[in-house]
Amino acid sequence: MPDMKLFAGNATPELAQRIADRLYISLGDASVSRFSDGEVAVQINENVRGSDVFIIQSTCAPTNDNLMELVVMIDAMRRASAGRITAVIPYFGYARQDRRVRSARVPITAKVVADFLSNVGVDRVLTIDLHAEQIQGFFDVPVDNIFGTPVLLEDMQSRGLDNPVVVSPDLGGVVRARATAKALGDIDIAIVDKRRPRANVSEVMNLIGDVEGRDCVIVDDMIDTGGTLCKAAEALKERGAKRVFAYATHAVFSGNAADNIKNSVLDQVIVTDSISLSKEMAATGKVTTLSLSRMLAEAIRRISNEESISAMFN
């Protein structure tokens, strides 16, 4: 069996170290820095010939820098004769640009990134909770898109929720909400239906479902600025919700996210370490981070040993 080696870029070094610790191996020796003009500089400082190489790198902000680090590291490994190269991308950036809407003159950037990674020589991709599952079809190599839900469910089950209801923040998240509700014992779901009655009129948050006197669990794949999430939480509290928790795999937290979350009626926001939490977000006092390291370490072990990934979720 080829020797397994883990390497990390600069996007999520803490997560990479946690994964390495769980696999009882050291992170590989690689220098990932910048030339004086800002270009990515990579050097692999150990032998990887014939090795089963895993490169851990989220393509979160700064998205272009982190993507280029990943691409250049893959190329360096390929030129160093690595046996197999798996890109472990906990958060896959550009995933929200996955289609052309009404033939608009826009790119399908998720496809561009998939081609970029495939063409540079990656053999396999491991990621978590793609924003759109069909992105797997953009790749010409195998893609394992695993689910962060089990990590979030453990936390939900430990909180002693009072007569809980799972809430989808929009119509597009109903499938996720229903699956979460089923995993929690087939509990009720509610849906926040956001709509704008007419031009230049504020959005209205219509609530479908009963939340009065109940703990609400909002579930989503990611939180960006948090604006819609905070409005949804406000609508739930106005309808009599007891407590409101928000769960998401990816803590994008861009723009005014820190202020939005800090000043919101949300009781707690629970995310994972697919993206490192900024000091500004940590200072809000409302954000809890769960680690994906155990799940990713097990997935990496299974890939290296040619075992089933889907069996992890049976």
From Swiss-Prot:
Residues the record lists as binding D-ribose 5-phosphate: R196, D220, D224, T225, G226, G227, T228
List of residues binding Mg(2+) 2: D170
Cofactor: Mg(2+)
Binding site for Mg(2+) 1: H131
Keyword Ribosomal protein: no
An annotated GO cellular component: ribose phosphate diphosphokinase complex
Molecular functions (GO terms): ATP binding; kinase activity; magnesium ion binding; ribose phosphate diphosphokinase activity
Catalytically driven reaction(s): D-ribose 5-phosphate + ATP = 5-phospho-alpha-D-ribose 1-diphosphate + AMP + H(+)
GO terms for biological process, alphabetical: 5-phosphoribose 1-diphosphate biosynthetic process; purine nucleotide biosynthetic process; ribonucleoside monophosphate biosynthetic process
Pfam families membership: Pribosyl_synth (PF14572), Pribosyltran_N (PF13793)
InterPro entries: PRib_PP_synth_CS (IPR000842), Pribosyltran_N (IPR029099), PRibTrfase_dom (IPR000836), PRTase-like (IPR029057), Rib-P_diPkinase (IPR005946), Rib-P_diPkinase_bac (IPR037515)
EC numbers on record: 2.7.6.1
Binding-site residues for ATP, renumbered to this chain: D37, G38, E39, R96, Q97
Alphabetized Gene3D superfamilies for the sequence: 3.40.50.2020
Alphabetically ordered keywords of this record: ATP-binding, Cytoplasm, Kinase, Magnesium, Metal-binding, Nucleotide biosynthesis, Nucleotide-binding, Transferase
Compartmental location: Cytoplasm
Free-text cofactor note: Binds 2 Mg(2+) ions per subunit.
Active site positions: K194
Class in the EC hierarchy, top level: transferase
Pathways per UniProt: Metabolic intermediate biosynthesis; 5-phospho-alpha-D-ribose 1-diphosphate biosynthesis; 5-phospho-alpha-D-ribose 1-diphosphate from D-ribose 5-phosphate (route I): step 1/1
Function, in words: Involved in the biosynthesis of the central metabolite phospho-alpha-D-ribosyl-1-pyrophosphate (PRPP) via the transfer of pyrophosphoryl group from ATP to 1-hydroxyl of ribose-5-phosphate (Rib-5-P).
Family listed: Belongs to the ribose-phosphate pyrophosphokinase family. Class I subfamily.
PANTHER family according to UniProt: RIBOSE-PHOSPHATE DIPHOSPHOKINASE FAMILY MEMBER (PTHR10210), RIBOSE-PHOSPHATE PYROPHOSPHOKINASE 1, CHLOROPLASTIC (PTHR10210:SF41)
Subunit structure: Homohexamer.
Protein's UniProt name: Ribose-phosphate pyrophosphokinase
Protein's organism: Vibrio parahaemolyticus serotype O3:K6 (strain RIMD 2210633)
Primary gene name: prs
